[in-house]
Amino acid sequence: MLKLAIGGILCFISAYLGIIGKSYYDKRYRYLSDFNDFLLLLIDGISYAKDRLPEITKKYIASSKGEFSRNLNNYIVVIESTQEKEKISKCFDSKYLKKIDKAYLSEFFTALGKFDYDTQLSRLNLCKAEMEKTLIKAEKDCKSTGNLLSKLGLLLGIAIMIILA
């Protein structure tokens, strides 16, 4: 009876760890998807509506939830007080992003608003093209690796239970 109880607990722990792994990939995809949505809003706001950058950003923050929105809010606070590169890069230091994604976001938001209209628009379109590739890869990772981790966690838990029984 004790072995069965321990096996059940270990099965639960293993399945829970698998779900946490899946959650990581889901949240990473959501974060990058939110950034892509912001990027599209930014391109539309700059090219068609001719809005200013803080207005576009505050409009996005008001209509969105999630970690990217919170990081964007921190970015607005930092931009209004100072423009130090180190503080800007800390705004987008999410545990769900890879190092290359963090560096990319830091570079993007540091350079945002520092160019003339045409250059800024071409950089945004280039960023949009790169982000589409990254988003496709993140979605693929979410569907394959994330789902695999949750199933593998449950399967490992059942295997532990069988071994202990």
Model regions and ranges:
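N-terminal hydrophobic targeting signals that begin at the initiator methionine
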Residues: 1-3
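Short alpha-helix boundary/capping motifs
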Residues: 63, 70-71, 133, 152-153, ...
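Glycine- and small-hydrophobic-enriched helix-loop-helix hairpins
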Residues: 50-117
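Hydrophobic packing residues in well-ordered alpha-helices of helical domains and bundles
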Residues: 32-35, 105, 124
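Juxtamembrane/interface alpha-helical elements of multi-pass membrane proteins
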Residues: 6-77
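Membrane-interface, cytosolic juxtamembrane amphipathic helix immediately N-terminal to a transmembrane helix
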Residues: 99, 113-154
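Bilayer-spanning, highly hydrophobic alpha-helical transmembrane segments
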Residues: 7-17, 138-165
